[in-house]
């Protein structure tokens, strides 16, 4: 699991993708790489 996702951060989706190394996304308050 990557860093928490905050909707106030406009770059959060990109950070999640970078951390997951692909097209994964934020689910709720967390960045989940197994979906």
From Swiss-Prot:
Top-level taxon of origin: Eukaryota
Keyword vocabulary terms for this entry: Chloride channel impairing toxin, Disulfide bond, Ion channel impairing toxin, Knottin, Secreted, Toxin, Voltage-gated chloride channel impairing toxin
GO MF annotation terms: chloride channel regulator activity; toxin activity
Disulfide bonds listed in the record: 2-19, 5-26, 16-31, 20-33
Tissue: Expressed by the venom gland.
Name used for this protein in its record: Insectotoxin-I5
Domain notes per entry: The presence of a 'disulfide through disulfide knot' structurally defines this protein as a knottin.
UniProt-listed InterPro entries: Scorpion_toxin-like_sf (IPR036574), Scorpion_toxinS_Cl_inh (IPR007958)
A GO CC annotation given for this chain: extracellular region
Described function: Toxin with unknown function in healthy organisms. On glioma cells, interacts with chloride channels (probably ClC-3/CLCN3) and MMP2 at the surface of glioma cells. This complex is then internalized via caveolae, thus inhibiting the chloride channels necessary for cell shrinkage and tumor propagation.
